[in-house]
């Protein structure tokens, strides 16, 4: 399953912190950022399990950033 999130994260240091936390909490998840996109995309792939969508949103928000599912 793949989930795409819109964020307001602009700096690589912040993305590294968020990605580290995601990968520690959910080892089966692969997550990447695309900061060149206007929506500052967070792409999350769950190979063996569904993506914990709300938990990912909550994690990013507790770090002081906006995060929402990007709908087609």
Locations of regions flagged by a protein language model:
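C-terminal structural segments of small proteins and small subunits
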Residues: 6, 19, 47-72
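Acidic/polar N-terminal loop/beta-strand segments that form early-domain functional surfaces
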Residues: 34, 45-47
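Short amphipathic alpha-helix segments
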Residues: 9-26
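A generic structural signal for short, solvent-exposed coil/turn residues
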Residues: 23-25, 36, 59
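Short glycine-/aliphatic-rich beta-strand segments at the starts of folded cytosolic domains
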Residues: 1-11
């Amino acid at each position: 399953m793949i989930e795409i999130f819109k964020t307001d994260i602009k700096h690589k240091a912040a993305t590294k912190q968020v990605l580290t936390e995601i990968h520690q909490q959910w080892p089966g998840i692969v997550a990447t950022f695309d900061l060149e996109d206007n929506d500052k995309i967070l792409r999350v792939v769950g190979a063996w399990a569904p993506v914990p969508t709300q938990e990912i949103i909550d994690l990013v928000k507790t770090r002081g950033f906006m995060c929402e599912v990007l709908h087609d």
